[in-house]
Amino acid sequence: MNLSRIGFYTLTDDRARNATSTSQMMRGELILSSRCNFKCPYCRSVGGPDIDIEKAKEIINLWADEGLKNIRFSGGEPTLYSGLNELVELARLRGVERVALSTNGSASEEQYQSLIDSGVDDFSISLDACCAEDGDKMAGGRKGAFGVVAENIRWLSAVSYVTVGVVLTVANAGKTEQIIKFADSLGVSDIRVIPAAQEGQTLPTISVSDELINKYPILAYRENNFRTGRKVRGGPTRRCAIVLDDMAAMGDNHYPCIIYMREGGQPIGKIGTGMRQERQRWHETHDCTQDMICAGNCLEVCVDYNTKHESFNQRN
């Protein structure tokens, strides 16, 4: 399997072949705030205060010193963080190639345009419904939320790279096909369908045309895994290679990945110049198959990446 064909642009064969604790840092994800104006039923709040902007700048600069290629700002809802534009501009100034934002899609068009002007070129937005009644419920009962989100997805898709995440729960799983078709009508770049962590590990049968599924690499990858009986989560490799050149940060701490952090896992260590070495030691000593968080939540695409990294190392 060529990782580049899956659709997650930060996960490639070249990266798996070359990843070490001293290679270019390929990706960083920074939690800016736990605040959110939605109350999605499946969301696991990260808690804690907004990150101090000077601490956020410190993290970005430390990552940039390691040649950071891709950064993602998330939360909570990162558009509620007052210093977001300043951090985006700093990332661009330091040479970061791709700047991504995980957002619920509720901000104003003016704010999203200002973020594009500052340097954001990747938007990840949740789309868990295909109609206003269901969409407002999935946002925690916020009336009118779905219409705002849908229109923002539509116009952002015309000017930027936009993926939508369809989180399936018992409330919306029966409308998976309608949601996919609606997302397609908005002009998105890709569609990430995934069951909520609380709802189990399998996807429902996706009864849309092969032509539509194959239009979206990530959707096609997930649908093929479902047809072959593969779960979205679980079954990790013994060693995690993603930690070598990838980092999730919240406050003063760095974590193996964003999922590990959201599931309540312990940080690898404190933010500082020795982070890459700490992550190397974690990679060498941590058995992911014996870690309940990894064993139950590692995404299949991460398993494929780690498997590819192992195969390259065995050849060497």
What are these regions (language model features)?
Residues I51, D117-D122, S126-G272, R276, ...:
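Radical SAM enzyme [4Fe-4S]-AdoMet core and its adjacent flexible, acidic
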Residues R35, K39, R44, G67, ...:
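Conserved functional loop/turn residues at catalytic and ligand-binding sites
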Residues I31, R72, T163:
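Conserved beta-strand segments that form the floor/walls of ligand-binding pockets within enzyme
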Residues C43, I71, V99, F123, ...:
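Hydrophobic residues within beta-strands of alpha/beta enzymes
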Residues G48-S102, S106-D121:
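Conserved Radical SAM active-site core
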Residues M1-P49, N61-A64, N214-P217, R233-G234, ...:
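N-terminal pre-core extensions flanking Radical SAM catalytic domains
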Residues G28, I60, V88, Y112, ...:
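Generic structural signal for well-ordered alpha-helices
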